């Protein structure tokens, strides 16, 4: 699967889905060669937390990549969600998920679980190195049994994730600033 985020080229593959952490349900704005999140005036950083996930679930041996850029403080991320359920307004929501999040100083990996009244947020990895805002960056994640193999530009690492489900929904999220997504590819063994 090779998807460019140009007008009319990506919508049939994805579904909007949202974390239970935030009540808003924003959409991406289409630009000529990419999709971008918008400023909302609600969040502290003033930008929407916007997610789209592929419609099918994937497991071990799947490799997903995206090309994205971000403005200062932006954090484009790969979303790995266990399950989806509908909220009272009919929007898809996810409660347990992992994030591989780029930012100006490298990337982080988070494991987030929805609890009864709050979220348990576990910081699994911080990999520090400079990433330039406004420049396109390539992110690839390969799902392995309870492991994630991660490449960001020319750097790589492998991470043990004991709570990684066998089958997951995969997609992208724009977080903590303005983010642009240009392309997404997916391969399976």
Each language-model region and where it sits:
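Low-complexity, Ser/Thr/Pro/Gly-rich disordered linker/stalk regions
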Residues: 1-62, 147
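Ligand-recognition surfaces built from glycine- and aromatic
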Residues: 165-189
């Amino acid at each position: 699967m090779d998807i460019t985020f140009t007008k009319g080229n990506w919508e049939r593959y994805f579904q909007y889905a949202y974390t239970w952490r935030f009540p808003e349900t924003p959409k991406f704005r289409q630009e000529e060669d990419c999709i971008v999140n918008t400023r909302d005036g609600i969040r502290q950083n003033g930008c929407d937390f916007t997610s789209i996930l592929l419609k099918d679930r994937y497991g071990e041996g799947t490799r997903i990549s995206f090309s994205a850029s971000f403005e200062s403080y932006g954090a484009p991320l790969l979303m790995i969600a266990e399950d989806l359920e509908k909220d009272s307004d009919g929007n898809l929501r996810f409660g347990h998920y992992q994030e591989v999040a780029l930012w100006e100083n490298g990337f982080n990996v988070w494991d987030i679980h929805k609890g009864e009244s709050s979220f348990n947020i576990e910081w699994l990895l911080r990999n520090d190195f400079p990433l330039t805002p406004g420049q396109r960056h390539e992110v690839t994640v390969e799902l392995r049994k309870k492991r994630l193999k991660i490449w960001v530009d020319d750097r790589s690492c492998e991470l043990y994730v004991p709570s990684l489900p066998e089958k997951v929904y995969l997609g992208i999220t724009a977080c903590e600033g303005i983010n642009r997504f240009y392309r997404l590819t997916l391969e399976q063994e």
